[in-house]
Amino acid sequence: MNSFRESDEEDNNPFSGTNHLYASGIGAVPEGDDDFLSAEVDTADETVQETREQMMSRLFGECEGPRESSAGGWTSGSMGSIGAPDGHSDEVTEFGIDTVLVEGEVRTPGRARVPASYPDAEGSLGALRIVDAGQYKDTFGNYAIGYTIAYEGRQVTRRYSEFDSLRQALARLLPTVIIPPIPSKHPLIRYFLNPLNAENDIRIIEKRRRLLSRFLNNCHDITDIREHTVFQKFLNPEYIWSEVLLTPPVSILPTNNLLAPPLNPTKPSPLHLLLPTPPRRTTSYGSPKTNNPEYDIRFTELESLLLRYHKCLQPVLASSRQKKIHFKQLASSLADLGAYYNAFSLEDNVINLPHQMDQIRDLSRAIEKIGQAVDVNYVSSELLVENIMILLEEPIGEMLQFVQEGREVLRFRMQKQQQFHIIDTTIKKRRGRIEELRNFQAQLARLEAALKQNAEESPTIARAVQRLDAQHLHKQRKSPSGELQWTGLFKSRSGSVRTHDSLTTRPVTGDVDVDLLSDEERAREIARLEGDLEKLNECYKLIQRDMLQVNESMARSFDWFIMYLHDTWALVLRNYTRTLLNWLKDCLTAWKNARVTIDTIAV
């Protein structure tokens, strides 16, 4: 299904229903000589074409020959060549500047150059293809827009909402992996006012089809996603997706990935439930440090790189949309202008001057050629608008979404860093408190030993010590310090960190000065703090292991992601350059043909 062919674009053709050259669109004109092309123009065009091929060779290098893929997909040795799908190996065409893949076809100059899905960094359309999109009836008898996926000889139809639920499930199952984005949902008000219709919204469906195809192939390129059972079930027609969402591992996902193993969140250990939950909003990225400074530095640099990408791509996307609007307006003006020229060229039929008929015929023919040149400009501009959307606007929008997803993954690591920081700080405070209590206990022991020695030598000192002990015991009985409740294993004196509810039922005396505690309370608090330290040390080992897994997994994910960004950006620039050169070449050739005809007029 070609979005350009089946859209309402051809309704804008002012020559539809006539005998004009472009009555059926520019795609109806066969490759080769135009009906108004003379021999002189052929020679001139060959010279122009040779010069142009030399220029393209300097820009893009030599194109390698096509090669077949063992998986039956689209492959290419470089950006310059593209193969044919299985069963059509005889229809392989060199992918030069004038050839672009459209829906599994190789089209030549003068035909629609609108690919169904822009190639990846290797010039391939990927292992997964969405071969059809339209209305279908699901297993529950509901009618919806379905997208048929072809993969490894099997086909399965999924709805957009199922793609969305797949991505959400993958984001929760793989919090350390950058999950490729999908096209955004339409506003809810749009569905009330104008529900999506397979006949009237072909362009929207085709755009989603292209972007969802990119989503599937990007997921397939990532090993962690490709080998995950949920992704494999999504591509398997034997599974009903609504049932997959109600069965493990999706159904047993934790509500908070911070309280679960980062690489296997469906199997949390009891210690994970003891970890603190840092706040979602964070003000700075690099404040909490771990015991892996090289990873800290690397991910801080990645955060800066993603921010730069976002700042660069945002204005490019806005500019591409603006240019698309301008070219649409230009194409509309050219359509009107071409129609006027063609109508004016027919005036020779109403002019009856026998002695000047030859000059009038030549003049009408020249005017007609000018009109045809304007028509070529119009149709080429329409194709350029379509290519700007597919080859520039869509991939840049996808890259922006990708950058946002990368920053979300970095935010997850930041929260794990804060968990590490909270546990490390709490351990240090507990050890400091134990040391303080033990030092005070030792000082009291030394003081009591000195007083005991002096009391044996002086009865007056002994009576004074007994009186002070009685007063101190009376104050301790009135003091409510023993009734204080603690607020969690990781509670500090400032008390700003939320902790799990299971750790909020034990008494704490950490807010009381050590000199106000009795010997029994000090001993009890030391025993409690030592018990807490055992759990904290286990949590510390756990968070260290989690951070190591997070760092290694995210490093692999970002290695792929940064390469993807660089390759996609290079591919976008090259495809956009090819599109502009095609547009300029078509327009220039049409005007050269018109000029040759004009030069033959006898003045």
From Swiss-Prot:
Binding annotation for a 1,2-diacyl-sn-glycero-3-phospho-(1D-myo-inositol-3-phosphate): 159, 161, 185, 208
Q: Where in the cell is it found?
A: Endosome membrane; Endomembrane system
SUPFAM superfamilies named among the record's database cross-references: PX domain
Output the Gene Ontology cellular-component terms.
cytoplasmic side of endosome membrane; cytosol; phagophore assembly site
Location (main, coarse): membrane
Q: Does the keyword Membrane apply?
A: yes
The PX domain covers 121-241
Q: Which domain of life is it from?
A: Eukaryota
Which Gene Ontology MF annotations are present? Answer: phosphatidylinositol-3-phosphate binding
Region annotation Disordered: residue ranges?
1-36
Sorted alphabetically, which keywords does the UniProt record give? Answer: Autophagy, Endosome, Lipid-binding, Membrane, Protein transport, Transport
Kindly give the membrane topology term recorded for this protein: Peripheral membrane protein
Residues in coiled coil? none
Q: Which InterPro entries match?
A: AH/BAR_dom_sf (IPR027267), PX_dom (IPR001683), PX_dom_sf (IPR036871), PX_Snx41/Atg20 (IPR044106), Sorting_Nexin_Autophagy (IPR051079)
One Gene Ontology term of the biological-process aspect is: intracellular protein transport
Q: What is known of its domains?
A: The PX domain binds phosphatidylinositol 3-phosphate which is necessary for peripheral membrane localization to the perivacuolar punctate structures.
Role of this protein: May be required for cytoplasm to vacuole transport (Cvt) and pexophagy.
Which family would the database say this protein is a member of?
Belongs to the sorting nexin family.
Protein name, please?
A: Sorting nexin-41
The gene for this chain is SNX41
